[in-house]
């Protein structure tokens, strides 16, 4: 499944635009491949939506994926972009991410993904600790990236992640 289940990721803000690819076709190993074992999964910080504030989210796919992930104790930052193509845009996030370093509004929420090795021992998941289990992580990605995994494929993926 991990090398053969085809995925087409389109219109995912923070991913397709960050990589300059309107469509990303591949499999799980397109990003989580052997050269990246032991390192961050991708060398580029990406915004996959885990730090978005659900009550302010306008992207239906992010909102659906965030529905299960709530961390009420985290502050929500309101950021008004002052320069570049996002000037005047107001964004809400629980983790400013790379923007704290770069000062760029486009970097809000962008983070480097952690390595997958030893994942089962590192709960809770995501930078904000919003997912308590690997099942919640898999469900988030399945909804966020419209992967279309069956219940059996999700269970298989969780079992695989636990084995790393």
Name these PLM-found stretches.
Residues 144-151, 161:
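Long, low-charge, small-residue-enriched segments that form tightly packed helices used
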Residues 25-26, 153-156, 164:
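Loop/turn elements at helix/coil->beta-strand transitions in domains of secreted/extracellular proteins
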Residues 121-122, 140-143, 163:
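Short, well-ordered loop/turn and helix-capping segments at boundaries between secondary-structure elements
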Residues 13, 133-136, 152, 156-159:
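Extracytoplasmic/secreted proteins, especially bacterial periplasmic and envelope-associated proteins
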């Amino acid at each position: 499944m991990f090398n053969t289940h085809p995925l087409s990721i389109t219109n995912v803000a923070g991913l397709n635009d960050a990589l300059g690819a309107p469509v990303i076709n591949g499999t799980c190993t397109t990003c989580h491949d052997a050269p990246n074992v032991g390192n961050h999964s991708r060398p580029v910080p990406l915004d996959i939506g885990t730090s978005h504030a659900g009550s302010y989210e306008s992207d239906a796919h992010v909102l659906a994926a965030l529905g299960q992930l709530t961390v009420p104790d985290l502050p929500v930052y309101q950021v008004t972009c002052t320069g570049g193509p996002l000037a005047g845009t107001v964004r809400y996030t629980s983790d400013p991410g790379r923007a704290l370093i770069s000062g760029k509004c486009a970097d809000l929420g962008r983070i480097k993904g952690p390595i997958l090795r030893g994942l089962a021992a590192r709960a809770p998941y995501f930078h904000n600790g919003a997912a308590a289990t690997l099942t919640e992580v898999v469900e988030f990605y399945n909804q966020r990236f419209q992967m279309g995994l069956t219940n059996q494929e999700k269970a298989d993926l969780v079992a695989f992640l636990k084995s790393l």
